[in-house]
Each structure stands twice: as C-alpha cells, then as structure tokens.
Amino acid sequence: MSQTEEKKGIGRRVQAFGSFLSSMIMPNIGAFIAWGFIAAIFIDNGWLPNKDLATLAGPMITYLIPLLIAFSGGRLIYDLRGGIIAATATMGVIVALPDTPMLLGAMIMGPLVGWLMKKTDQLIQPRTPQGFEMLFNNFSAGILGFIMTIAGFKILAPLMKFIMHILSVAVEALVHAHLLPLVSILVEPAKIVFLNNAINHGVFTPLGADQAAKAGQSILYTIESNPGPGLGILLAYMIFGKGTAKATSYGAGIIHFLGGIHEIYFPYVLMRPLLFIAVILGGMTGVATYQATGFGFKSPASPGSFIVYCLNAPRGEFLHMLLGVFLAALVSFVVAALIMKFTREPKQDLEAATAQMENTKGKKSSVASKLVSSDKNVNTEENASGNVSETSSSDDDPEALLDNYNTEDVDAHNYNNINHVIFACDAGMGSSAMGASMLRNKFKKAGINDITVTNTAINQLPKDAQLVITQKKLTDRAIKQTPNAIHISVDNFLNSPRYEELLNNLKKDDQA
C-alpha cells in the first residue's frame, strides 16, 4: 500500500470515528433542545418561572439525556438489544455521580456494552440448546447488564470523575486566566479539516452540559457553533471576491448563517489558506466577547444557526448574544477583506478548493458541491480511475468494492421489488435529508407513489435495506453495512444525473 493510500485509509478511520461520536449525540439534539426550553423558561430566572415545571430540568439532564446517548451508542453497535443493555448499564455511572451529567460516561458505556452484548451473543447463541433460545437470550442480556452496571458504578464512575475534574480544571484555568479565546486557535482550523461535529458534540457538549447544570449556562456551547466567523469570510467574498466564488457566496451566506450548515464556507477558506487567520481571530473575538459579558447557552446551539442563537438566548442577554456574533463576523470580515485585497489571487479556484476540502474530510460534501454546480449547469462525470490490481482485495480497496457493486451504473440493476430508497450520509441529518427530499419530489412529479424515500446515518442503515444512495466517498462504508442492498454512488446529493436514470429504470420495471 502506498503512503498516499495509507494516509487516505487513516483519514477514513478518523472520519468514521468522528462520525460515530456525533451519531450518538445528533439524534438526541431534540431532547437537548426540549430540556433547554424547559430550563430557559421555567427555572427561577427563566422567561416564565414555574417551580413545579422547573423540577423537570434536573432529571432530564441527569437521567434522560445520558440514557438516550447510551442507548444510541449501544444501538449503533448492536441494534435494539445493544441499546437497551447499554442504557441499563449506564445507570451505574449515573447513580454513582448523581450531581454530574454523565454524558461522557454514557458515550463510553454505550458502545462498550453494545459491543460486549454482540460478542456475548456470538459466543452463546451457537451453543444454545433448541427450545431454550428465549431463556438464554434474556438471561445473557440480564447478566451482562447486571455486571456492567456494577462495573460502571465501581470502575467507570471514578474514572469519569477524574477525567471530568481534569477537563473542568483546564477549562476553568483558561477562563480565570482569560485565555479561553485561545481555544479558537485549535478549534477553527480543526472544523475545516473535518472535526467540527466531533469537537462540538464530542467535547464541548458534554463539558457544557456539566457547566450548564451547575451554573445555569455555559460559554462552551458558543465556541464552535458561533456563525459569525464563517459569515465574515462569506461577506468578504461577496464584496471582494471574483467569478464563481463571488457568485456563490450570497447563497452560501444564507445557508451558513440561517441554516447553520458551517461546512458551506470551508472551501472559501481553503482557496486562500491565509483566511485561516481570519476565522481564528473571528472565533477568538466571539469567545472573548461572551467571556467578557458572562454569556452562555443553557443547551447546545445545534445547528450553529443565527435563528437557533436567537431562540436559545437567555432572558436579558439577547444583546450580548448579538454582540458576540456581530463582532466575530466583523473581525473575520475585516481580516479576510485585508487578505483578499492585498494578496495575490489564489492559484486554485473554488472547484479545486472544494475537492481539496472533500479529500481532507474523506468524503464528498453535497452542500459544498452545490457551490460549484449552482454556478453552471454542466455536470461532468468523474473519469474512471486506473484498472484495479487483480491482487487487491475489494475489502481493502474501496474502488474495487464499488466496481464489484456497479455503483455508478444505474442500468446494471433490477428494481422490480424496490419499495424503499434510503439516502445515507455521515450523520444522517444534513445532506442526506436534502437528497431524500429532492428525490421524493422527483418521484411525486413522475407519479411514483409506491416507493418510500428516507434518509439515515450510514451506521444506522438497516440490514434489510433495498436501495441505498450515498456519495461516492462513503459508498464503501455503506456496502459493508448493507452488503445485500443495491448501492448507487453520486457525486453530490443535490445535482446528479443518476436520479433521472433511476426514474427511467423504475418506470420501465413498473410498466413491465
């Protein structure tokens, strides 16, 4: 394996790990928001104080949300059975530390117990006497839950207490030393590299929940989610940009600022690497502003949209929220404008920067790809890469795996029994949802009413999936998750000629 291929493999594994972390948190964002509303509205200093309803906030953050996260983590590993036992075992960690929201503990216990349940079943089921299946299944799950609950109480809880203490001390040290803005030096570049979800949902959300439970709000929820720095970059392109970058920056600004999809501005930074300075300084400004005003959110601001910021702003602190976003955008804009005004034009264009970003992320970005496709209606197919070596294993070589499944030849498959199409992406909430919505509209216009179109995360693809549509960089993972399904690869979810090819094939099979 060449060094380049090895780096790509490592990148895929890192991206998969980051996706797994965010897949535990993102499906439960609704619960976070519900808890945030209850805390923001009904507590003593809320919008409508109510002592009775305020009592809901504590149990929700202490029990409900950690259990949901543990269930999600266990289910990702071993479906419903893994999720149930994972949630059961996580009670040990929660009860051991009732004053600390055990989100980090749940993120560890959930996948671990799900994996142990899977291995336990693999060991016991082949040795189970006929007629005793239910007995063995129930007792094996119960015994594992019993053991892991005690392990969580006696082993993981003290470990979590130590880890949370170290992390809390580090964050508090930065706060007291007025150095918290320096975190942006790492956070802003890491977002653009591919770690935005892993950072926000894997680090700041658990720590922020602990702070919010103790202090009522947390500044940590604002560090990665502030839409100001990205808006400043896009505003600079609107005024000082040229060509495709300028033309697409207006739509990108709306998607980023109001929709909260931050990845839309990543290619604009990659086009001019000096713009990393702009987003870092913008991020530092936002954090410094919120630190100076004592601002924070009661729950995660996800997605990082200005609308979400407005809805989550605590009573009496709306102006503080506006100030943090405005100053972050202003500093980012001024620095970006100076860079664009007084430096040479970049050698690479928006298309190349988008490709660079996608290569770095280890996957296609349908939102970023729309930047390129919206400026021109020509959609060119990728040229076939070189012949795959006969000695390559399709499991190790994604290109060979895609060739074996004919993922780019829509006409090569039989669609007679298809009644469900699934769009799958990393987290199952953003780009795949847009792709599914687009195909549903196409089906509706074509009179195809007997086929359901849904979206999900790759890790949550059902084993009985019939037809799965993914972006090319993710198709190999989807195939390994559902090897018996038909798989179609697209360059981006928002503009692919394969949708029309699929429609034509479905119509033919329906008429036949």
UniProtKB/Swiss-Prot annotation:
Listed Polar residues bias regions: 380-392
Q: Compositionally biased, Low complexity: which spans?
A: 365-376
UniProt region (Disordered), positions on chain? 355-402
Has UniProt tagged this entry with the keyword Manganese?
A: no
**Subcellular localization:** Cell membrane
- Membrane spanning residue stretches: 29-50, 55-75, 140-161, 171-191, 279-298, 319-340
Q: Which residues carry this modification: Phosphocysteine?
A: 425
Q: What cystine pairs are annotated?
A: none
On the Cytoplasmic side, which residues? 1-28, 76-139, 192-278, 341-512
Q: Cite the PTS EIIC type-2 domain residue spans from the record.
A: 17-349
* Gene Ontology biological process: phosphoenolpyruvate-dependent sugar phosphotransferase system
Q: Which residues lie on this side of the membrane: Extracellular?
A: 51-54, 162-170, 299-318
Q: How does it sit in the membrane?
A: Multi-pass membrane protein
Provide one Gene Ontology cellular component: plasma membrane
Residue span, PTS EIIB type-2 domain: 419-512
Catalysed reactions listed for this entry? D-mannitol(out) + N(pros)-phospho-L-histidyl-[protein] = D-mannitol 1-phosphate(in) + L-histidyl-[protein]
Where, by residue number, is the active site? 425
Fill in the domain comment.
Answer: The EIIC type-2 domain forms the PTS system translocation channel and contains the specific substrate-binding site.
Function in brief = The phosphoenolpyruvate-dependent sugar phosphotransferase system (sugar PTS), a major carbohydrate active transport system, catalyzes the phosphorylation of incoming sugar substrates concomitantly with their translocation across the cell membrane. The enzyme II CmtAB PTS system is involved in D-mannitol transport.
What is the recorded name of this protein?
A: PTS system mannitol-specific EIICB component
Q: What is the lineage of its organism?
A: Bacteria, Bacillati, Bacillota, Bacilli, Bacillales
Q: What is the gene name? A: mtlA
